[in-house]
Amino acid sequence: MANWSCQDALKMYNVPYWGAGFFNIDALGRVVVTPDKTRLDCKIALVDIIEQLRKQGYATPVLLRFPDIIKTRINALFGAFEQAIQSYGYKGRYQCVYPIKVNQQNQVIESVTRAFADKPALGLEAGSKPELLAVLSHHHDLGSVIVCNGYKDREYVRHALLGSLLGHHVYIVVEKPSELELILDEAARLNITPRIGVRARLASQGSGKWQASGGEKSKFGLNAAQILRLVERLREADKLDCLQLVHFHLGSQIANIRDIQGGIRECGRFYAELRHLGANIEVVDVGGGLGVDYEGSRSQSHCSANYNLREYANNVVWGIGDVCAEFDLPHPMIISESGRAITAHHAVLISNIVGMESQLPTSLPDAPDAEAPMLLQNMWDSWKELHEKEDPGLLEIFHDSVSDLADVHTQYTLGMLSLHQRAWAEDLHLNLCLKLKVMLDPVNRMHRNLQDELNEKLADKCFVNFSLFQSLPDAWGIDQIFPIMPLSGLDQQPTRRGVIMDITCDSDGMIKEYVDGVGIENSLPMPEMRNDETNYMGFFLVGAYQEILGDLHNLFGDTHSAEVCLNDNGEPVITNIIKGDNVDNLLRYVNIDTSVIRRDYQKLVAHPSLSEETRKALLEELEAGLQGYAYLEDE
């Protein structure tokens, strides 16, 4: 393409659609972030931040957090609901609750609580005893909302009730029938009036990777008959007024707004029926599900969403309000647990490219001699047809070449062809694929599948200094798509494509799908790598679930992390730098005693053939290894 510009790069990587206004490309071809949308002129080049961290001794990979993005997302969510409430004349208020399971890192929870400072009240959700204790410690404002989900034992219930004594509005949501007796027993023992919620198991179900969270066979919630028994038990105990919240959850990352509409309507009916049964329901908790458009396609794909914040809020507010109008009921407070939508955009993983392995042929093999096997002659004939025929059948030529190459491999295994002949055939096939790729017409639908196949086949292997299993576990576990792109050189037209490999010893350690301007591709367009500088790759929208789900495959642990904030002058300030795991820590995680390792080193270097100077140098080197970063480091 002539006159390549950064606008072309934005389109190629689909940045305007998945970036949500936070990410852009500057005139120098660098990826920049605008974390605070009230200060659009404050743009931060990601490579500049990484270079500053390197000077301070922090090598990549590094996870960068932008707290201002969390604040911006919370403001946008509140704004969408406030506008919907005003538009529909809704009399209740909206309460955003952050479920900390999405990202329990202390810096993230602190960023969320700071962002709530000017909001009506802070809301946090816990799904386990450890999460509840963390949530209680982060609440400083009286009247803050705490939602207690998940399976519960007596201790969990007791801690939740004690939260009420601290002045918080703690809703203990009954997920299974047996939990109600625990709540009633502990509340009576502590002489505390509980706020009880019930999770309704809806027939409505979302679609996608997380659809099992909803529907009649979901792991959580009470069915209609169980809810009726719960109401009768509370009435019998004279505690029906304690039932104040009804909750449902269709699943995380709901892509289709119609699924949300159906769930809201069904939950609204539960609200209406419970009110008519005498329950003092004041809150409808619509759970999570608010999607993030990871691929920027605004579609029903499982990594996208065919709606925005405003449409989501409109459907929730209108749907509940419509049920209230139909049955002449008061408008309840609305809670949403939109953790993914709050945190996904705020974190970017950045690491260096450590190697490129080209799959392109370096030269064209010579024509086979007259005595060469017929199979090799046939392959050469396909090559000549591609060049000499006026209108060659491109698909047929490719299929013939693939078939011939398969026969070459078979005959080589049987000893009928030599290693030189196999290498000749493979080189010729690669040359043919490269020529075909140039000749294919991307507008021709018949050519598109082959174009994709050739892009993948001819793509470079791009080795990046990170662990997929530690930093992007959902890309491996559930094939989630994350936007990925080089952080510089984007003012140049991409000349090649790459497939990203991590540095684990696992063939699954590779990214299989990439966001592209025309859809999802199996390789990533890349500019030429510069040999005179470090080339960085950015992995975007990794702020939800990835850190806590990451594992220690090959003993690659947590990366360095840092927060980047804007000061009053609009300049970036790097704060809260946390060192990633060193080797010593990682060995201890798997119960390897590093003191024993050090003692064994002492024994090994005590060999009489080693001088005292050599022994000292060896021990220093081994100790440096134990204290070093688990990832690849520049000397």
Swiss-Prot record:
InterPro entries: Ala_racemase/Decarboxylase_C, Arg_decarb_HB, Arg_decarbox_C, Arg_decrbxlase, De-COase2_CS, De-COase2_N, Orn/DAP/Arg_de-COase, PLP-binding_barrel. PROSITE patterns: ODR_DC_2_2. Gene3D superfamilies: 1.10.287.3440, 1.20.58.930, Alanine racemase (3.20.20.10), Lyase, Ornithine Decarboxylase, Chain A, domain 1 (2.40.37.10). CDD domains: PLPDE_III_ADC (cd06830). GO terms for biological process: arginine catabolic process; putrescine biosynthetic process from arginine; spermidine biosynthetic process. Keywords: Decarboxylase, Lyase, Magnesium, Metal-binding, Polyamine biosynthesis, Pyridoxal phosphate, Spermidine biosynthesis. GO terms for molecular function: arginine decarboxylase activity; metal ion binding. SUPFAM superfamilies: Alanine racemase C-terminal domain-like, PLP-binding barrel. Substrate binds at V284, D285, V286, G287, G288, G289, L290, G291, V292, D293, Y294. The modification N6-(pyridoxal phosphate)lysine is found at K101. Its cofactor is Mg(2+); pyridoxal 5'-phosphate. Catalyzes the biosynthesis of agmatine from arginine. Belongs to the Orn/Lys/Arg decarboxylase class-II family. SpeA subfamily. This is Biosynthetic arginine decarboxylase. It comes from Tolumonas auensis (strain DSM 9187 / NBRC 110442 / TA 4). The lineage of its organism: Bacteria, Pseudomonadati, Pseudomonadota, Gammaproteobacteria, Aeromonadales. The gene is speA.
